[in-house]
A protein has these predicted regions:
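N-terminal active-site beta-alpha-beta segment that forms phosphate/nucleotide-binding
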Residues: 2-99, 103-109
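Conserved phosphate- and dinucleotide-binding cores of soluble alpha/beta proteins
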Residues: 84-190
Length: 190
């Protein structure tokens, strides 16, 4: 059965909202096991995002702690969203963070990262389909950023759920993932 992204967003938002804290913690541990299978040795700059606990997002901070321990040379950066222009840029992490208008943590805007410097990116999502198209929160920030970042970036989705059937309404502006990790599998798309 095929589904459009709006329907998928609704279904996946409900599924994620129904997760308990214990279920999220267990799935984060399983996601970490999948992430340990990735060779991070060629990554120099990894773009990530601060998880929204109230939205039951995967705990990227747990994943980063693991990566930083084994690969201390990797530099992490995080997005700052410009709501007025619907654009987003990444900045190297800072010890202190600020909250944006949506209540999302952001680094202080000191060291902007050129898109071509990012090797790998954790891409937030609600879910994904069998071709690597993601469904996010519907604002298009990541698709716009990835379009200007170029082809070389590894786009890794991290999902609590397995892929859905293919979305019926993808278009040329949708940037597919390189891979997506779930608690039970890793899916490669490129």
């Amino acid at each position: 059965m095929h589904i459009n992204k709006a329907e998928a967003r609704k279904i996946l938002s409900q599924k994620r909202a129904a997760l308990t804290d214990a279920e999220c913690m267990k799935m984060d541990d399983l996601l970490l096991i999948q992430l340990q299978r990735i060779d991070w040795s060629r990554t120099e700059v990894l773009a990530s995002f601060y998880p929204l606990a109230h939205k039951n997002e995967p705990n990227t901070l747990l994943f980063e702690q693991y990566i930083k321990t084994l690969y201390p040379f990797i530099r992490f950066c995080y997005p700052i969203v410009e709501t007025a222009t619907h654009q987003m840029d990444f900045y190297f992490e800072t010890e202190t963070v600020q909250l944006n208008a949506f209540g999302i943590q952001e680094p202080l805007p000191f060291n902007k990262v050129a898109p071509e410097l990012i090797d790998t990116m954790f891409v937030p999502l609600l879910g994904f389909d069998q071709k690597g198209h993601r469904v996010g929160f519907g604002k298009g920030y990541y698709d716009r950023y990835l379009a200007k970042a170029g082809e070389g970036i590894q786009k890794i989705g991290v999902s609590y759920f397995e892929p859905m059937d293919n979305f019926t309404d993808t278009n040329e502006f949708d940037v597919p993932l390189s891979s997506c990790i779930t608690p039970w599998n890793t899916y490669e798309f490129e």
